[in-house]
């Protein structure tokens, strides 16, 4: 698939920039971006959690250098929020939506310093239209990013190259 190849390439480009790739550590896009990072000699961290009702994964994917096992889903997200210098959001499901919402909420309320949130493709655009009138409450976030509404916390990009460019 073209999307899979592009996510692998994204991981490779991030590693070439010297970035550590942090993900949920399991399969799908998490594995693809980690595979790409490892192919370029990069470091990967997987923040995992195993207490699903129906366990899907028994271990982190083979491309994870360091696994951090969280005690809860919320701790998993909290660890990623604290460790990341930027967030790249790929198409996904409810887990990705929860991570994105937590990231936006933490920045909106000033619980973490504002960091780049880059949305690869248009997948999440319909979800974020509801934030156009949602004000940013943190004065620090407003001043650091020169924004007033929550939808301005994110940057949409069309492709991997544009994503990497926005991280410079």
Task: Annotate each PLM feature.
Residues 1-45:
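Glycine-rich beta-alpha loop segments
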Residues 27-36, 124-136:
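Glycine-rich, charge-decorated loop segments at or immediately adjacent to ligand/cofactor-binding or catalytic sites
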Residues 38-42, 61-66, 133-138:
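Short, hinge-like loop/turn segments at secondary-structure boundaries
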Residues 48-49, 90, 104-132, 140, ...:
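Short, acidic/small-residue loops that bind anionic groups at enzyme active sites
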Residues 49-83:
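Glycine-rich oxoanion-binding loops at beta->alpha junctions
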Residues 52-60, 76, 127-128, 133-143:
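Short, glycine/polar-rich helix-capping loops at beta-to-alpha or helix-loop-helix junctions
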Residues 74-111, 118:
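Active-site/ligand-binding-proximal alpha/beta "capping" segment
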Residues 79-86, 141-168:
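A charged, well-structured terminal subsegment
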């Amino acid at each position: 698939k073209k999307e899979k190849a592009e996510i692998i390439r994204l991981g490779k480009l991030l590693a070439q920039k010297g970035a550590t790739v942090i993900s949920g550590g399991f399969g799908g896009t998490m594995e693809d971006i980690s595979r790409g990072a490892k192919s370029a000699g990069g470091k990967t961290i997987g923040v995992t959690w195993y207490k699903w009702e129906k366990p899907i994964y028994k271990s982190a994917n083979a491309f994870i250098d360091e696994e951090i096992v969280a005690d809860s889903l919320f701790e998993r997200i909290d660890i990623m929020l604290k460790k990341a210098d930027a967030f790249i959001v790929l198409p996904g499901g409810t887990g990705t939506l929860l991570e994105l919402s937590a990231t936006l909420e933490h920045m909106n309320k000033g619980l973490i310093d504002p960091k780049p949130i880059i949305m690869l493709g248009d997948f999440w655009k319909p979800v974020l239209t509801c934030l156009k009138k949602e004000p940013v409450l943190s004065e620090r976030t407003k001043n650091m990013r020169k924004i007033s509404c929550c939808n301005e916390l994110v940057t949409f990009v069309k492709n991997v190259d544009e994503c990497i460019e926005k991280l410079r």
